[in-house]
Curated annotation (Swiss-Prot):
GO biological process: DNA recombination; DNA repair; SOS response
Stored CDD domains: RecA (cd00983)
Protein name: Protein RecA
GO terms under cellular component: cytosol
Family from the record: Belongs to the RecA family.
InterPro entries, per the entry: AAA+_ATPase, DNA_recomb/repair_RecA, DNA_recomb/repair_RecA_CS, P-loop_NTPase, RecA-like_C, RecA-like_N, RecA_ATP-bd, RecA_C_sf
Function as written in the Swiss-Prot or TrEMBL entry: Can catalyze the hydrolysis of ATP in the presence of single-stranded DNA, the ATP-dependent uptake of single-stranded DNA by duplex DNA, and the ATP-dependent hybridization of homologous single-stranded DNAs. It interacts with LexA causing its activation and leading to its autocatalytic cleavage.
Pfam families: RecA, RecA_C
Cleaved signal peptide residues: none
Length: 368
């Protein structure tokens, strides 16, 4: 028998730490030269941590989101039942963004935007870009073009359920188009995500709820458009109407509850409640009074409310009226509350985990 050749253990080459640092610096320099500045950086760098936010118009929701609003350069999904306040909340975001000089666009796939109502919510309709596309492909192409331009800061897509594929529109009633919309959304979001981050554009998708058939245990509710949006969204808001606001026997608004079911930029699972008044939108002063009282900025003794020792009104309605008549004081109180509740505006973003999403494997929606 031939003798077995003795195997020599080749020693692992040890790299000098100084040479390692030089090699890493050279590699980073080459990457930045080839792909541009900021293409790679350390997570602890200030640039990577600073997340610009757009206010939602609700002080409570802004604080619950952790960074003072919805994050720029990210995808956000807002979903809920019919007449729960989804469009009202997004129009409120548009109004706040426009106040800060941002350019906004509204892709109205449902063809149902009411400009009169939008103006009542504070939206500058003259400066708002609007598109009413014929099909889902056209809507998402328009969205992609606006994002790539770098000139639009906030884009609303209303809604995912109305993004009907061209093949379905041109087909006959009753034709089966299994998974067509899910594939459309998956392809579009793959293209959009990198461009959205590069141009620091906020894209909000409004979505509807459907019921799963045959679910015996667990939540039978699901959103339309497959699983892709659940994965790509940095923030997902579940908005519901929890009650009504009455003036005597007349219903003048609705009590609204929002649950943050996913948040990649701050801790998730927080809930907040506020009122949406018909023809007015989010009741900002009502919310401000409640938060100011609960955090000690406004004191209440009996039925009287007081601020810095001065009585501002007897009863809630009179106190709200006083705040509306003194916007500079209301603004100061709001800023004090923001400084207290949003103590770290540059909160470290969490990894790309799916938080609350018990979604199926990403490939499942691709195969539909």
């Amino acid at each position: 028998m031939a003798e077995k050749k003795s195997q020599k253990n080749t020693p692992v080459k040890q790299i000098d730490p100084e040479q390692k640092e030089k090699a890493l610096a050279a590699a980073l320099a080459q990457i930045e030269k080839q792909f541009g500045k900021g293409s790679i950086m350390k997570l602890g760098d200030t640039q990577a941590l600073d997340i610009e936010a757009v206010s939602t118009g609700s002080l409570g929701l802004d604080s619950a989101l952790g960074i003072g609003g919805l994050p720029m350069g990210r995808i956000v999904e807002i979903y809920g039942p019919e007449s729960s306040g989804k469009t009202t909340l997004t129009l409120s975001v548009v109004a706040q963004a426009q106040k800060n000089g941002k350019t906004c666009a509204f892709i109205d796939a449902e063809h149902a935007l009411d400009p009169i109502y939008a103006r009542k919510l504070g939206v500058d309709t003259d400066g708002l870009l609007i598109s009413q596309p014929d099909n889902g492909e056209q809507a998402l192409e328009i969205c992609d073009a606006l994002v790539r331009s770098g000139a639009v800061d906030v884009i609303i897509v209303d809604s995912v359920a109305a993004l009907t594929p061209k093949a379905e529109i041109e087909g006959d009633m009753g034709d089966s188009h299994m998974g067509l919309q899910a594939r459309l959304m998956s392809q579009a979001l793959r293209k959009l995500t990198a461009n959205i981050k590069a141009t620091n554009c906020l894209v909000i998708f409004i979505n509807q709820i459907r019921m799963k058939i045959g679910v015996m245990f667990g939540n039978p509710e699901t959103t339309t458009g497959g699983n892709a949006l659940k994965f790509y969204a940095s923030v997902r808001l579940d908005i519901r109407r929890s009650g009504v606001v009455k003036d005597g026997d007349e219903v003048i608004g609705s009590e609204t509850k929002v649950k943050i079911v996913k948040n990649k930029v701050a801790p998730p699972f927080r809930e907040v409640q506020f009122d949406i008044m018909y023809g007015e939108g989010i009741a900002r002063m009502n919310e401000l009074l409640i938060l100011a009282e609960s955090h000690g900025f406004i004191n209440k003794a009996g039925a009287w409310f007081s601020y810095e020792g001065e009585k501002i009104g007897q009863g809630k309605n009179n106190a709200i009226k006083w705040l509306k008549e003194h916007p500079e004081v209301a603004s100061k109180i709001e800023q004090d509350i923001r400084n207290l509740l949003i103590s770290n505006p540059t909160f470290t973003a969490t990894p790309d985990s799916e938080n609350a999403d018990n979604a199926d494997d990403e490939f499942s929606e691709e195969e539909l």
